[in-house]
């Protein structure tokens, strides 16, 4: 089954794109960010393997932790940075820790797709394995690594993956590039913020 409307691309199906997440003075809008993350998880359905279920489940679990905090204290959580600062001030860190793990997963996904988009002859599995080694692998236990390694090995062939994103490959690559640039910008902002003293517990 196609993951895109006739004449369109996968990116037309997203409820929220990272290109539509407001970022003002380096502050990231919480609601739109979470919607964009939820939309990103549908990419793992396009990858088509049940092996990616743990990856998707991990991301949706962390999205829920952040949203639960936002719903509990909406005024204090309009941006991700405000949410983190205000949660840590209460001596709790459930949502903050969720954001750390969610951002690692976003970084992994962004690096994998960027590497694959840049290297047109590379299979998707190679790009995802490389990105996993650069990102999530450093933080996963020996129990978790085999589960994620199985997902890397279960990715579709490159030609099949891109065909699932749209019929017009030039348009797919262009839209993927724009979407990725926005995602990478958000990941960089979060990497810097989460590494700062004010995001530590």
From Swiss-Prot:
Keywords, in A-Z order: Lipid transport, Lipid-binding, Transport
Stretch list, region Glycolipid transfer protein homology domain: 28-168
Highest taxon above the source species: Eukaryota
GO molecular function, one term: ceramide 1-phosphate transfer activity
Phenotype seen when the gene is deleted: Partially loses the ability to secrete liamocins and leads swollen cells and accumulation of intracellular lipids.
Uses in industry and biotechnology: Liamocins have high bioactivity against the pathogenic bacteria Streptococcus spp. and can be potential new specific inhibitors of oral streptococcal biofilms without affecting normal oral microflora. Liamocins are also able to inhibit human cancer cell lines such as breast cancer cell lines T47D and SK-BR3 or the cervical cancer cell line HeLa.
A cellular-component GO term for this protein: membrane
Cross-referenced InterPro entries: GLTP_sf, Glycolipid_transfer_prot_dom
Cysteine pairings via disulfide bonds: none
One Pfam family recorded for the sequence: GLTP
Induction per the UniProt record: Expression is regulated by the cAMP-PKA and HOG1 signaling pathways via the transcriptional activator MSN2.
Function statement: Cargo transport protein that plays a key role in transport and secretion of liamocins, glycolipids (also called heavy oils) composed of a single mannitol or arabitol headgroup linked to either three, four or even six 3,5-dihydroxydecanoic ester tail-groups.
PANTHER family (UniProt xref): GLYCOLIPID TRANSFER PROTEIN-RELATED, PLECKSTRIN HOMOLOGY DOMAIN-CONTAINING FAMILY A MEMBER 8
Identification of the protein by name: Glycolipid transfer protein
Record organism: Aureobasidium melanogenum
């Amino acid at each position: 089954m196609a993951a895109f409307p006739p004449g369109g691309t996968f990116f037309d199906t997203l409820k929220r794109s990272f290109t539509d997440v407001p970022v003002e003075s380096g502050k990231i809008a919480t609601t739109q960010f979470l919607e964009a993350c939820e939309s990103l998880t549908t990419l793992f359905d396009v990858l088509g393997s049940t092996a990616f279920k743990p990856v998707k489940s991990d991301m949706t679990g962390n999205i829920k932790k952040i949203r639960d905090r936002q719903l509990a204290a909406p005024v204090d959580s309009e941006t991700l940075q405000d949410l983190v600062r205000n949660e840590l001030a209460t001596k709790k860190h459930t949502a903050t820790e969720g954001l750390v793990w969610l951002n690692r997963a976003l970084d992994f996904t962004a690096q994998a797709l960027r590497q694959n988009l840049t290297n047109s002859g590379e299979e998707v599995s190679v790009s995802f394995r490389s990105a996993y080694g650069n990102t999530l692998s450093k933080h996963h236990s020996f129990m978790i690594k085999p589960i994620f390694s199985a997902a890397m090995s279960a990715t579709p062939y490159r030609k099949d993956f891109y065909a699932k994103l749209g019929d017009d490959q030039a348009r797919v690559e262009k839209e993927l590039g724009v979407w990725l640039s926005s995602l990478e910008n958000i990941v960089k902002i979060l990497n810097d913020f989460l590494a700062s003293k004010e995001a530590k517990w």
